Amino acid sequence: KPTRAEINDIVSTLASGGSGIVLAAETAIGKYPVDCVRIVSRIIRESNNPKYFSNGAFNNQSVDYLLSLSMDGIIKPHGKGELVQQSISNIDYYTIKNLPSLKINDKTISDVIQISEGVYTPLTGFMCIKEIESVLSNNKLLTDDSWTLPIVLQITQKDAAKLPGKGEIILIDSKNGERVGVLDIQSVEKFNSGNFIKSWFGTEDKNHPGVKEIINNGNYIVSGTTFLFNSYRQQTKMHHEYSPKQTREIFYHNGWYNIVGFHTRNIPHTGHEHIQIKALEISNADAILLSPVTGIKKT
């Protein structure tokens, strides 16, 4: 961790017209050469930030800021710039409220996790019919943020009859009865899938796996905000899974601000490697994020 005097020396050097910093001792024989380069790189990058530095000097917040996990230099999350984080640690509070419950399958559980951990930012919950129409017709959420695929929770008429029109319910894992999280219901609506299938999938062929799923999943949809129980996530999270918050912290810690994203459903091969290397070269990126498609496969 650099001292205030060391930070002041670097900032003063830059403010006086210096075009480079030599880190002879620490980078050559020190215990933390990579970390040293990272923090100095950040000081250089942030030395023009008027919030913390003024006329080559730093204020009392500067050291804490430079050593914090601030995401100021990383591109803002999609939408209004705020990463959606909707988790609940106090599961007992919801247990004693004796709320209605709804059993959900693996696909819906996956959506609850992705929404609540911010993967689907700026989406905060399952869509209502009006929002589905906006997405399919205009590629826009009701907030006017760009979005291209409906995220829905379909249920049967039998389940719909048990739910309140508004308010909180507990979401239950249909496999083992574990409590997944809470859904704060905005609406329960009759859903005519035939009105959406063509624009959704580009076909009405009932052999199409997506079409078949929508037709068979029930003729009601529930919209509302999702919240994930931390206790459930701790039980189910795989060691290779990273949330958006975690990946952003990794980017910051490594001093990466320009990152190439590569989304794939296949094991990377030579063709992928060529594309990835070219993308890194063209964009002069700091790193590449490999984002594999995982989960339930289409059959």
Question: Predicted regions span which residues?
Answer:
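C-terminal helical cap(s) of enzyme catalytic domains, especially alpha/beta-barrels
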Residues: T27-Y52
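Glycine-rich phosphate-binding active-site loops on the catalytic face of alpha/beta enzymes
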Residues: D9-P33
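Short, solvent-exposed amphipathic alpha-helical segments in soluble enzyme
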Residues: P2-E6, V37-R42, Q276-L280
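Hydrophobic faces of well-ordered beta-strands that scaffold small-molecule active sites
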Residues: K1, L14, I21-L23, V260-F262, ...
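Catalytic cores of large soluble enzymes that bind and process phosphate-bearing ligands
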Residues: P2-A5, A25-C36, H239, S243
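Nucleotidyltransferase catalytic core that binds NTPs
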Residues: G56-T299
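Active-site-adjacent loop and "lid" segments of alpha/beta metabolic enzymes
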Residues: K1-S16, Y52-N59, S68
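Conserved structured core elements
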Residues: R4-I7, V34, N266, T270-E273
